[in-house]
Amino acid sequence: LEEMPALTHQRFVVVGAGQSAAEVVQYLHGHYPQAEVHNVFNRFGYSPADDSPYANRIFDPETVGELYDAPAGERERLFDLHRSTNYSVVDPALIETLYATEYRERVAGRRRLFMRRASAVTSVVEDTAGIAVQVRNALDGRIDTLKCDAVVLATGFAPAPLGPLLGDLAPSAPVPPVARDYRLATPDDVTAGIYLQGGTEKTHGLTSSLLSNAAVRAGEILTSVLERQLFDPPVRQVDVGELGRVPDQHTYATSEAR
């Protein structure tokens, strides 16, 4: 954004309704005081993130083992139930801040923040004059064309498939089997260990793509690597606790620290 030329239309469009989208909206609104910011999303409004302590136990280190040992259907059920701890949600305080900003602008009669709810982008055309974005409101079918200086896509991501990375080593199964220690299952003639940092949500739970369990996971992988070394005498097993114990009262596994 800092390398952009001078704004021609004084308008931004942000697509998405998660934490990243809301933070981008807040940033653009604050750093470009003359510009409009239009947030386009298909829901009616932002959904608050569930940061309640009971729900956030799904990020606890010991929960990883429980989920891994559970039936696949149960893991999927819990994943769907607790998506609101991480996916397509916004911190409640930020929701309140943006709502208050929009409300003040409505009262003052000088609007710069627009929430285009139940809407979708149907066309984007870029030329030398900027970007023309067509937005369709699903409630009444109305289509507006917004001429803007930049479009920010905060629509999330899909994890990259492992197949292209593994090449000929890729198994025929759609989801490669992953052990509890994050080691990818390989044929007997493959002696090297392949460990996954991320990409294990379907087997190890929601915490796989977050920082909540990163230190513990690194310790578990290190222990597994050392245990599999063919040294004589055997390498001493590393206890995860020896890597640095976190006080019991620490909230590293909760959403506040994510």
State each model region's role.
Residues 1-19, 23-258:
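Flavin (primarily FAD) cofactor-binding/catalytic cores of flavoenzymes
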